[in-house]
Amino acid sequence: MYKIVTRRELVPHISLFEFSAADIAAKTKPGQFVILRIDEDGERIPLTIAGANVGKGTITVVCHEVGKSTKQLASLKEGDCILDLLGPLGKPAEMKNFGTVLCVGGGVMVAPLRFQAQAFHQKGNKLIGVVGARTESALIFQDEMRGICDELYVATDDGTKGYKGLEFLSELLKIKKIDRVIVMGPIVTMKTVSELTRPYGIPTIVNLIPIMVDGMGMCGACRVTVGDRTMFACVDGPDFDGHQVDFEELMARLKMFTPQEKIAFVFHEAGGRSH
């Protein structure tokens, strides 16, 4: 069992959890993820690690309520326990002094992006950060990213704060010498940024946490096409070359499960059980 030592709502429907997990904290590096299960009947939920405190023996994850299982997780309180926490999984992000790194985060994935940005900063990189969300009220970790980055830009889909959308990056890429780009967020965000950086030949790394079950590559649920190869996000990633990922295929596969997620969420809201 893994105890929740800290739980706080960052914005509506997005919550931060700090779990007591000394064994995982001791091994965690930025870019890795965990798979948690709330109880015996629970689904496996993959979440990118947003922080680790070896001294306290804790790891931090941030969860967005989008379905039955994440809604159930969000209902837990400090002091509650979950059954399983498997990790750290996946390959750590490559960390060295690249020069100038552009870190683009969207939605809930700004949280693990901050974890990576801290590590890039410690390696001596100059950081340009972009924090994005659907609307101003959904933005998270703006102040924290501002404290790490040399420059920070804010973007929202509806233009309620900062730039509207990510098209402003086209101009930024023209005037800045950027050596590496890290993108964490919705699939469409990673696809858009990868398309914008492609003409400049800037190495662009995307963090893929698609559908996962076992986290060890045996189930094949997390397969992605990268270049001409089929790879598995849980063991080969989760970081991949954004210019090689087949985003159209990935988005189509993820949409296959949308109806089931909606049905499970309705059952959960009604107090029923869906398997």
What do the PLM-derived regions correspond to, one by one?
Residues 6, 51, 154-156, 206, ...:
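Structural signal for conserved beta-strand scaffold positions within catalytic alpha/beta enzyme cores
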Residues 68-214:
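FNR/FR-type flavoprotein reductase catalytic core
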Residues 42-51, 89-99, 234:
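Short, Lys/Arg- and Gly-enriched loop/turn segments at beta-strand edges
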Residues 36, 84-85, 224:
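A generic structural signal for residues embedded in beta-strands
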Residues 1-78:
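Ferredoxin-reductase
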Residues 39, 87-88, 227:
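Short, surface-exposed secondary-structure boundary micro-motifs
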Residues 232-236, 240-275:
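Short Fe-S-cluster ligation motifs
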Residues 112, 187, 209-239:
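Local cysteine-cluster metal-coordination motifs and their immediate loop/turn environment
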